[in-house]
Design a protein with these regions (language model features):
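Short beta-to-alpha transition helix within the HATPase_c
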Residues: 1-22, 45
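Conserved sequence/structural motifs within the catalytic ATP-binding
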Residues: 2-6, 33, 67-69
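Short conserved segments within the C-terminal catalytic ATPase subdomain
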Residues: 16-26, 60, 103
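Conserved short strand/loop->alpha-helix "switch" segment adjacent to the catalytic nucleotide/phosphoryl-transfer site
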Residues: 21-49, 53
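ATP phosphate-binding glycine-rich loop and adjacent ATP-lid/helix-beta elements
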Residues: 46, 50, 54, 84-119
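Short beta-strand/loop element within the Bergerat-fold HATPase_c
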Residues: 60-79, 108
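Glycine-rich/acidic phosphate-handling loop/turn and adjacent ATP-lid/helix
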Residues: 70-95, 127
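C-terminal beta-strand of the catalytic ATP-binding
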Residues: 78, 117-124
């Protein structure tokens, strides 16, 4: 069963670990995230993991970043022979989610490593 905190960044990572992903959690919430922002972060993690699972479920994955008073950054770094394949995917659903929250998404690939970074400003309320 999924953890009770399934819709949080930490819960998403815990669930992935329990599901067999080789994932390390280096995310730090210096400021507690609102339930809505935490759920958005969790959704981004689940979306990225769905891409990873299709290609290389055993890829070494690290989630880092932080939540502060003003923003939340998430960086999901994957070391895999499939890094170039990940880099060719537009990740449009993740970009759309980030941009719908006033944020941005970038990806970077080099030498067997692929990184997706999301920056979300804090303080906005969830859409009605």
């Amino acid at each position: 069963a999924p953890p009770g905190n399934f819709a949080t960044i930490d819960g998403a990572i815990t669930h992935a670990q329990q599901s067999g992903f080789a994932i390390v959690n280096l995310f730090t919430a210096y400021t507690p995230l609102s339930r809505f922002r935490d759920a958005v972060g969790a959704e981004i993690i689940y979306l990225v993991l769905s891409h990873i699972a299709e290609l290389d479920k055993f890829a070494s994955t690290t989630v880092s970043g932080a939540a502060t008073d003003t923003d939340c950054t998430l960086a999901i770094r994957v070391i895999s022979t499939e890094a170039d394949t990940l880099a060719q995917r537009p990740m449009g659903e993740i970009r759309a989610l980030a941009e719908s929250q006033g944020g941005t998404m970038d990806t970077n690939a080099q030498a067997g490593t692929w990184t997706l970074s999301v920056h979300l400003p804090l303080g906005e309320s969830p859409p009605a």
